UniProtKB/Swiss-Prot annotation:
GO molecular function: serine-type endopeptidase inhibitor activity
Residues at the site labelled Reactive bond: R341, C342
The keyword Phosphoprotein belongs to this UniProt entry's keyword annotation: yes
Function, as annotated: Inhibitor of cathepsin G, kallikrein-8 and thrombin. May play an important role in the inner ear in the protection against leakage of lysosomal content during stress. May be involved in the regulation of serine proteinases present in the brain or extravasated from the blood.
Keyword Phosphoprotein: yes
Organism: Macaca fascicularis
List of residues that carry N-acetylmethionine: M1
Protein's UniProt name: Serpin B6
Transmembrane segments: none
Residues bearing PTM N6-acetyllysine: K195
Assigned protein family: Belongs to the serpin family. Ov-serpin subfamily.
Amino acid sequence: MDVLAEANGTFALNLLKTLGKDNSKNVFFSPMSMSCALAMVYMGAKGNTAAQMAQVLSFNKSGGGGDIHQGFQSLLTEVNKTGTQYLLRTANRLFGEKSCDFLSSFRDSCQKFYQAEMEELDFISAVEKSRKHINSWVAEKTEGKIAELLSPGSVDPLTRLVLVNAVYFKGNWNEQFDKENTEERRFKVSKNEEKPVQMMFMQSTFRKTYIGEIFTQILVLPYVGKELNMIIMLPDETTDLRTVEKELTYEKFVEWTRLDMMDEEKVEVSLPRFKLEESYDMESVLCSLGMTDAFELGKADFSGMSKADLCLSKVVHKSFVEVNEEGTEAAAATAAIMMMRCARFVPRFCADHPFLFFIQHSKTNGVLFCGRFSSP
C-alpha cells in the first residue's frame, strides 16, 4: 500500500498545484477518488496512452499495473468499510456508448478491483436522457449533495466514454467547537483585502508542529474514531501560501505530517466555518500534466476496454465539503475550556488567512481530500 500511497500523494500535490494556479481561488478535490477513477481507465489503456497515464498518476514508480489495481482494491475496501464513525461515499462509474461493445474481461476487472460498474448508454440517439441518468445516479450516491454533475450540453452524440467521479464526506470532530464561541471575524484574503467569516474557536490539546524552512504551522484535528484527520498547514502572515505549495513534495509532506514527530500541546484554535463545492473539468488539467493521447480520437488506445475506436470524452470531478462546529465530545470539552482559560500562555493557531488542508486516512496514509481555503 505504501507504493500506492506515494503514487496517489504525488498525484494529489501535482493536482493541487495545477488546480490552484489562480492564487485567489478556493480549491477542493478528492485526489484518492480521482486516482481511483483514472486507474480504472488505465486498466483498459495500452501503448503510449497507458504510458502517459502511468506517468501522470505516478504509477511508473510502482513497477507494474497489477500491483496498482490490487492496491486500490485493498484501499477502497479499507476506506469504504462500514461501521466507521464517518460517512464517506465515493461514486465511480464509467459510462460508455453502447454501440462500442466493451470487453467482458474489462467490465469484470472494474467490478473486482474498483467496486465499479461499466454502464452502457445510448449517447448517439438519447443524449439528454443519458445525461439525466448519469446525474441522478450521482445524486443518489452522494446523499443528494451533488445533484447536477453534468451540465446541459456537456455530453453530445459523439460522446463515447464518460468517467464520473463524485465523493461526499461527513465527519464529526473528535472534539467539538462550541457554537457559542463562534463569532464574526475578519479573514485576510490578501494584504489589501479582508472579508467577514464565521470564526470557530476552541482551546484543547492537539498535535502540532512548526516547519521552519517554510515558516508554517501544522495542526492535526482528528475526526471521531481517529481514523481520519484534518491536517492544516498555516503559513505565518509574512509568508505567501504559494511558497508553501511550491516547496511541497510528497516526501516532505510525509516528513512534515508524521504524527509521532509532533508535540501534543494545549493550543487555542481559530478556524473558519466554511462550505466548499468545487467542480472541475479535468481534461485540460490532465492534458497539461501530460496525459494528452487519452482524449484524442485516433491517438487514444483503449484496446484493453473495447475493439472500437475510443477516446475519453469527459472527466468531471465534483466534491463537496462542509467544515463546522459539530462533534461529539461537546459537554466534556466545554467544561474543560472554562477551567483552562486562565492557565499559562497557550500557543495560538489562528487560521484568519489562507491555508491548505488535507483529510487523511490514518491507517493507509491515503490523502482522501485536498484543499486550499483562500477566501470566504
